[in-house]
């Protein structure tokens, strides 16, 4: 897979960008803050409908603009698809595929497949559980676009359930002894059923994914850091004890176990006013030997583990018969010589690689020799603020 052309309008610092891309390795050179990362972020947003840098859409729209647009023509095994996404900071985003408007932007999932490695990926190892959950959910949505809808529905149910637990605390505590309490508990029962059903689908998909990813993560880490301890990953849930007797996890078993755990923790949830059970509280344990990587890994081991997660993701998507686009965002300056060479070796075997770097000297020498194209990103101050420009001679 590769992107043949990319167009941006009012996306962050880019009032307008039109660039033709080719298979091979393309690099965007520009000083920090000039807007080079915005280019690859836009491609990643088109692939995942989310940014690796921010959690909301508002920062993606250029100051004083009403919306932003990202358009790309993707080529996959000779077939071209044109994807267009309109990003609205205060309304629902809109999308079209081959100039035909689609019902929801989620229908674009899978049109562009990317794997992005960036300095922010250290948070996969050192950060909060939400980072690791998102890592899994993004891969699942890329491979099974329907699951993005399931996860969105789960999030809506969770929000409604939490709202009930917070606003109807007194009624819920009174229980079935009052009409108001009985009504609140009946509503909570309804949310419990939906939370368990949707949550079971999310968890089953995560379990299945980790079963595939685990060996690939181990292999990638062993290749990158052969002198280090072996890497392993384990899914950690709020219902671990209830599932421990099963060797395989299916949605039906998980749903029943979730319902049991929700019933057991109901009083605590009412007291705390929040949902204590479900995939929104799960985590992935990243292990080096018998120790968790978080808190025990060295800086080099942390980089190696983060890179291994992305390499495993890439290899998994590639095994689905599609070479995803590999994006390397300002990472070569952060890696030691050994890890740089490992990454160059991978990049040379990928159909399309997009790289950002602050200066040309950040690139390994053997990578410079195989570049397909190089673009320079600069900036210009205007009446409406600083804007980014591509390949403009001073």
Swiss-Prot record:
Places the protein is found: Cytoplasm
Keyword NADP attributed: no
Function according to Swiss-Prot or TrEMBL: The RecF protein is involved in DNA metabolism; it is required for DNA replication and normal SOS inducibility. RecF binds preferentially to single-stranded, linear DNA. It also seems to bind ATP.
Protein family membership: Belongs to the RecF family.
Name of protein: DNA replication and repair protein RecF
GO biological process: DNA replication; DNA synthesis involved in DNA repair; double-strand break repair; SOS response
Residues bound to ATP: 30-37
Naturally occurring in which organism (per UniProt): Corynebacterium glutamicum (strain R)
Keywords: ATP-binding, Cytoplasm, DNA damage, DNA repair, DNA replication, DNA-binding, Nucleotide-binding, SOS response
Molecular function terms from GO: ATP binding; single-stranded DNA binding
PROSITE patterns per record: RECF_1 (PS00617), RECF_2 (PS00618)
Cellular component terms per the entry's GO annotation: cytoplasm
Signal peptide: none
Highest taxon, organism lineage: Bacteria
Gene it is expressed from: recF
One Pfam family matching this protein: SMC_N
Keyword Nucleotide-binding: yes
Coiled-coil stretches: none
